[in-house]
Amino acid sequence: MGQKIHPTGFRLAVTRDWNSRWFASSGDYSRMLHEDLKVRDFLKKRLAHASVGRVVIERPAKNARITLFSARPGVVIGKKGEDIELLKRELQKIMGVPVHVNIEEVRKPEVDAKLIADSIAQQLEKRIMFRRAMKRAMQNAMRLGAQGIKIMSAGRLNGAEIARTEWYREGRVPLHTLRADIDYGVSEAKTTYGIIGIKVWVYKGEMLGRNERPAVVENENEARRGRRAPRNDAGDNRGAKRPARRTGAEQAGAGDKAGTRTRKAGVDDAAAVEKEVS
């Protein structure tokens, strides 16, 4: 069901793409998979304060290309590019192949689910009330174009003895609609009372699948003209008054007059025939 399954995995090959894009034989698959996991864990610790939302790993022809989606690319690059060069060398030691690092800037971090979850986790670690942090994040997301957002926090909230789960939602979040563009992110806040988990769902609107085409929306005026019945006459009769509807008595009187005219025409025809015979 859409309520239970991972939103990204549910939409793979429909509206979402994989975060690791490479092909390997059966012998190399497990090794490369473990390398990817090590790289992601390393980047998570190394770039914890760089607001990295997503990491995409590609392996073209005995090389590796890593794309970092960050809201603070200057922190990743460092002064005169020193930090990113050091990062490349460390990644090459882990993967064993030449590594190219690309950085993509996240223009609106307020509507990125992973960055929202990380922001709430940092606030909880600073002893900010969880309700205030969640509602502030929801307001910022809705203000910057999100059509819906849902945030869930679980653990010893506010240092309570018994762990519980609380969630808030604003707008609509259709988890079971495959064409819905839903961004999902998870983060953990390490507090003095224990770990608090944060999950965020952000609904950004509907998007087309890979093989779908946009529906053709015709002009409203043309659609209205197409539904209008054709006119009987070819001339332009705009502004002309329509004949008023006749009542039942008027219609009966018109029928009597028509019958009288028919009988009179018959008498005239008979008189003309007699005159010709004589």
From Swiss-Prot:
**Which parts of the sequence are annotated with region: Disordered?**
217-278
Is rRNA-binding one of the keywords UniProt gives this record?
Answer: yes
Name the GO terms of the biological process aspect: translation
Q: Ranges for the KH type-2 domain?
A: 39-107
**What's a single GO MF annotation on this record?**
rRNA binding
Write out the GO cellular component annotations.
cytosolic small ribosomal subunit
| Entries under NCBIfam families matching the protein | rpsC_bact
Quaternary structure, per UniProt, is: Part of the 30S ribosomal subunit. Forms a tight complex with proteins S10 and S14.
Q: What name is this protein filed under?
A: Small ribosomal subunit protein uS3
Q: Top-down, what is the taxonomic lineage of the species of origin?
A: Bacteria, Pseudomonadati, Pseudomonadota, Betaproteobacteria, Rhodocyclales
